[in-house]
């Protein structure tokens, strides 16, 4: 059976090396084994495939549930390791799926902003906090630079310009099933977002300067 993930990664890397000035930094920071959450800034459709390309292991993703209503897209996304998520509301099915993925020792990528930005880091959403604390797994921050100039599907197929993916150091939070108050959630979220912000230029950091 064809491994769609490997095929897509091969094509994407070829495209990046052909059309763009592509750079990867800190790839050795990625643990080879064990449950892992990648957290990254999000500017364009190509961003998830960048995480997949640089990772030495398969990465699971989430995508807005509306995309899965189109059957060909749903088949492709599921084959590529994506799971639907309902935005702007608490999606318990997502949390159950994510915890199951991590309990199996797999890797998951989340974009804490919840949607694409214009290149400047948006305020993070709290969902990542509850998952990080509930599981206590390793977290890898990733900073992506240059993809805001590659919007739409064309930016996935034919990315151009200088694109830099910088991988930071592993960090994690103490595992706990206790309820978190607002101040604790905000403090944990700020730490996650600041770890991402440190990997991108100051002009892209928004409120996390």
Feature annotation, model-predicted:
Residues 17-25, 89, 147-149:
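Short gly/ser/thr-rich secondary-structure transition/capping motifs
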Residues 22, 57-58, 83, 105, ...:
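Secondary-structure boundary/capping positions in well-ordered alpha/beta enzyme cores
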Residues 9-10, 17-18, 32-89, 97:
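Catalytic core of membrane glycerolipid acyltransferases/transacylases, capturing the structured
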Residues 1-21:
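N-terminal membrane-anchoring alpha-helices
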Residues 27-31:
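Glycine-rich helix-loop-beta junction characteristic of Rossmann-like nucleotide cofactor-binding loops
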Residues 26, 41, 63-64, 81, ...:
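A secondary-structure boundary/capping signal
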Residues 3-4, 93-209:
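Non-catalytic C-terminal accessory region of glycerolipid acyltransferases
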Residues 24, 61, 82-84, 139-141, ...:
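Conserved beta-strand scaffold positions in the cores of enzyme catalytic domains, especially
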């Amino acid at each position: 059976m064809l491994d769609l993930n490997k095929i897509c990664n091969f094509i994407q890397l070829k495209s990046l090396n052909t059309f763009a000035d592509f750079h990867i930094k800190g790839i050795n920071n990625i643990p080879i084994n064990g449950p892992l959450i990648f957290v990254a800034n999000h500017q364009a459709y190509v961003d998830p495939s960048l995480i997949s390309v640089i990772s030495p292991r398969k990465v699971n993703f989430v995508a807005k549930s509306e995309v899965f209503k189109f059957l060909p897209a749903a088949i492709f996304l599921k084959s590529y390791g994506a799971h639907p998520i309902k935005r702007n509301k608490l999606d318990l099915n997502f949390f159950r799926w994510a915890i199951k993925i991590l309990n199996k020792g797999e890797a998951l990528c989340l974009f804490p902003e919840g949607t694409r930005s214009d290149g400047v880091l948006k305020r993070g959403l709290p969902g990542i906090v509850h998952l990080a604390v509930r599981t206590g797994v390793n977290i890898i921050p990733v900073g992506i630079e240059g993809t805001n100039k590659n919007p739409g599907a064309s930016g996935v197929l034919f990315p151009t310009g200088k694109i830099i993916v910088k991988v930071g150091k592993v960090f994690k939070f103490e595992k706990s099933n206790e309820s978190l108050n607002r101040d604790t959630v905000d403090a944990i979220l700020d730490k996650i977002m600041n770890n991402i912000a440190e990997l991108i230029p100051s002009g892209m950091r928004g409120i996390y300067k």
